[in-house]
Amino acid sequence: MISVPFWYGKVAGTDLVGGQDEDKPGILLKVKADICQNLTVYVEKYEEEFQPFIGEFMKAVWNLLTKIDPSQPKYDSLLARGMQMLTMISKGVAHEQLSAKDSLTQICERLVIPNMRFRDNDEINFEENPTEYIRADLEDSNLLTSRSSAAQLVQGLRRHNEANVTQIFASYVMNLLNSYASNPSEKWSDKDVAFHLISALAISGSTRMEGTTSVNEHVPIGEFFNGQVLTELKAYPNNHAVIQADSLKFICSFRSLLPANAFPSIIEAAVKMISSPVIVVASYAAACIERLLTVKEANRSPRFGAEALEPFIFSIFTAAFGRLAKADCQNNEYLMRLIMRVLDVSKGRVASASQQIMSELVAIIERIVKAPTIPAFDHYVFESVACLCSCLYDKDPAMVAQFEAMILPTMTGILQNDTASK
């Protein structure tokens, strides 16, 4: 069996050399990333046996990570794996080795903030590959990135030292926000880092269904929302698109902790942002409204139900269907899911526009029948039809019969042409 000192020699004794490709890691970088992954397993599974080596390995990994340029994609896996190892140490019995003020300051300055920076390849995905960007940024994907590992490192450090970590790291949040305020158009990336850092400091527990469920008591989420998030929503479209997306994502994350009286201002702003020419912003705006409509009170009643939603219903439909009509968003699952959610929550308050809504849905079905698209999008289209019929049946069964007449020819065509098997 290969000994632990052997691995140490491989980490500390080899010069960091990348491959010829500037974007992809060479063999040596891959090996070092794998070694860091193995070290993480040692710390997690065999902490007692590994205890004599933790200090040396931690120093070796630290030296390795801090001389890497995190802006280069080829180092992403190594940075992520290395920070995972430090995260595991921060959670275990050796956590005191990372708890000193100087250590925390160095970690924040040299690892966390640099690895939370918006990189060139992030900008490319944001503009040219929005699906990939959203999958990595908004959804609970299993993608391992240096940015996600930096956030996990912050959360790991909080486990045994929450008050001190929060105090030290929060000072950097303030510095970043002050830098942004001095020149928003040029320093937008500083606020982007601040958004990610405050989230890593604040979130203590979360679920996919509810978003954040518990928070760090030392982080004033309400104050940050009012001072830094709501102001960005109101500044649209005169602020940077990445900051627009960050603000909407923050609301998605902390939706269960926001009071009902904040929802109208959020929804009003988000409706406008659905029309953004930037696909990520339009998608986040739709996701923001949709997820707010899923928030429940302790008694399971909706925090923002049909009556509260009514003033916004038709503006939401106008914005969502209008954006779906554009070629770049015609198969956007977030917009379609929003339409489905509003139909479900509105409880029949769409009667006056129901025929127009059904016409829009039928037109979409006719289009996707010819060229099936994203499965989730197709699913939400048919769910929307079902919601519309269901919510109106008790009020006007004759209207549902009209809907059947509108949609049956299309459905018959699907069966006759055996579209599903093509």
Labelled PLM ranges:
Residues M1-K422:
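Karyopherin-beta/Importin-beta family HEAT-repeat alpha-solenoid scaffold
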